[in-house]
């Protein structure tokens, strides 16, 4: 997972914090961990970038981060992920910027304790790795910017390639930015158990959004995305798991940032709504407080609440009555109904000569009973995770 937090000079510009993160995929072996670290809103092929910058960067930078992730359920440690990543941005001219990222994930542990229809509760061992890279070129023109990106990710049984193009239009007073983007992804799934070989999945993504400076101290951003995919969505490692071969996703994200001159701090609020054709609806609420401190330090505590309904074809354990072979069915608890809280804190320090460092700690706790407006899916064990990410950066 990669993310950036950049400020673009003007007071209103520095209030926005744009995170582009890969969304979760419940058929990828790495997804039990990555689903917790992703926002499920970005187009594939878009690298971490200050999406509302209205001019080419005049300085380059390089960032190195290391993520340590672990999750568990009662009586069982599950997935461990160790993930170094590298991000860089270089201005090639006054109007052209290149940027890219590389990430390596080493994954080990056990799959979720889901209910296997043939043998009861199961937590099979998982060992995998993922390597991924992204590259993007952005050209700044008179009152607009055009970006082209490419992305590739490889696991032992999963290959993904994607590309995107985006178009941003700036108002004359530079207080408003319109954003439009289109992306496409081509995935191939070849599980080690041979259930399928080189099974395809193709996806098209569309984004439209606006960022508006409301005043010198406040800014709002709202994006909608729509995705349409066709291909293999079932989990080959779960017995009888059968999912539709088409999936569409609609998502709406709104962020609001308010600067307070007294404490020289920024309140960051966000809300995301997502609905997919599998029948699941999710809502995510997040609040963060960014507080600069003396001597180049800053701290940013945050709290996120996430809730989702179950997919139409999710069945609660034990093995459901009336099951018909060949019908859509899953016991994957990631498609169950639940709620989750994620408290986190980020600490950063700037040094001389363009150096900086940061550390983020987060804890995730998931329970069925925390579903908003419902009781959640019965028979699902509580799920917990924690991750620590440390980084160092140099601008030049």
What role is predicted for each listed range?
Residues 56, 78-80, 125-129, 138-140, ...:
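Short sequence motifs at beta-strands and strand-loop junctions characteristic
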Residues 62-64, 100-102, 148, 178-182, ...:
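Membrane-embedded beta-strand positions of outer-membrane beta-barrel proteins
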Residues 73-79, 111-117, 151, 158-166, ...:
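Outer-membrane beta-barrel translocator domains and adjoining extracellular loop/strand segments
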Residues 117-123, 225-257, 273-283, 296-390:
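Outer membrane beta-barrel transmembrane domains
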Residues 96-98, 143-148, 173-178, 216-222, ...:
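Repeated loop/turn-to-beta-strand initiation elements of outer-membrane beta-barrel proteins
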Residues 167, 217, 382-396:
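Outer-membrane beta-barrel "beta-signal"
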Residues 82-86, 131-135, 161-165, 202-208, ...:
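Hydrophobic, lipid-facing positions within transmembrane beta-strands of outer-membrane proteins
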Residues 66-72, 104-108, 141-143, 152-156, ...:
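Transmembrane beta-strands of outer-membrane beta-barrel pores
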């Amino acid at each position: 997972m990669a993310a950036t937090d950049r400020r673009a000079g003007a007071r209103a510009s520095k209030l926005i914090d744009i995170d582009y993160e890969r969304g979760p995929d419940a058929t990828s072996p790495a997804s039990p961990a990555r689903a917790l670290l992703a926002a499920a809103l970005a187009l594939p092929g878009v690298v971490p970038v200050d999406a509302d910058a209205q001019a080419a960067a005049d300085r380059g930078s390089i960032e190195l981060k290391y993520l340590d992730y672990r999750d568990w359920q009662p009586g069982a440690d599950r997935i461990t992920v160790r993930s170094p990543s590298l991000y860089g941005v270089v201005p090639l001219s006054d109007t052209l910027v290149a940027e890219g990222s590389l990430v390596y994930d080493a994954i080990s542990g056990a799959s979720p304790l889901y209910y296997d229809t043939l043998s009861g509760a199961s937590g099979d061992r998982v060992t995998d790795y993922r390597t991924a890279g992204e590259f993007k070129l952005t050209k700044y023109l008179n009152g607009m910017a055009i970006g082209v990106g490419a992305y590739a990710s490889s696991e032992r049984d999963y290959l993904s390639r994607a590309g995107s193009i985006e178009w941003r239009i700036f108002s004359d007073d530079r207080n408003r930015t319109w954003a439009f983007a289109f992306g496409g992804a081509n995935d191939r799934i070849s599980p080690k158990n041979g259930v399928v070989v080189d099974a395809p999945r193709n996806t098209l993504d569309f984004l439209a959004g606006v960022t508006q400076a409301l005043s010198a101290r406040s800014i709002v951003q709202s994006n909608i995305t729509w995705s349409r995919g066709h291909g293999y969505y079932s989990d080959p490692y779960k017995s009888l798991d059968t999912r539709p071969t088409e999936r569409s996703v609609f998502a709406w994200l709104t962020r609001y940032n308010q600067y307070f001159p007294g404490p020289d701090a920024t309140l960051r609020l966000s809300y995301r709504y997502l609905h997919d054709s599998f029948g699941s609806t999710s809502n995510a609420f997040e609040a963060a407080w960014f507080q600069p401190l003396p001597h180049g330090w800053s701290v940013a505590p945050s709290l996120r609440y996430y809730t989702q309904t179950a997919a139409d074809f999710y069945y609660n354990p034990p093995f459901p009555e009336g099951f018909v072979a060949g019908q859509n069915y899953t016991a994957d608890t990631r498609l169950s109904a639940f709620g989750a809280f994620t408290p986190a804190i980020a600490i950063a320090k700037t040094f001389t000569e363009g150096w900086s460092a940061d550390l983020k700690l987060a804890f995730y706790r998931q329970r069925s009973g925390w579903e908003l407006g419902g009781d959640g899916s019965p028979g699902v064990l509580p799920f917990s995770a924690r991750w620590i990410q440390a980084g160092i950066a140099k601008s030049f």
